[in-house]
Amino acid sequence: IKLVDGDVFQESNLNRQLMTSKANIGEVKTEVLKRRLLEVSDAKVDTINAYIDEYFKLKNYDYVVDCIDSLNSKFELVKKAHEKNIPIISSLGTARRLSCMNIKRTTLDKTQNDPLAKAFRTLVKKNNYRKKINVVYVDTPAIKSQKLGSSIFTVGSVGLFIASEVFNDLLKEC
């Protein structure tokens, strides 16, 4: 497993990222997750404490899971995975969703009710990118409240859904 993220945990992550706690605010996300993974498994876990940009070198992996907030970084990762023929799933918006009942896997061009997906489609079109982009999103309109961010049950459910999709895709190759 290769974990890539240049971010550190902030207090705003407490409501949606299960591996964060008040004790690890300010710690590098990849290192905290690596420690947690090694507590529960014998997996080989490597980390890169960096953001994805046009200079990022994507190696050959069995699968890539994109959970990036930045649209430019998300697009760079998708392009690099496609160039290397590595399957990739991009996670889209979960902010202000109070239901995890409508999690869907589709392609970017078929998403609805998701402002992040709409912005990502705009970026993809602007760059004249024509390949299909596999995504997972919540097909439920966000509530209007600006006070509510992302909820752990929605974010967690999307994460588990993606893990299931990746696992099943890899099983098909066996």
Task: Describe these PLM feature segments.
Residues 1-174:
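Adenine nucleotide-associated cytosolic modules
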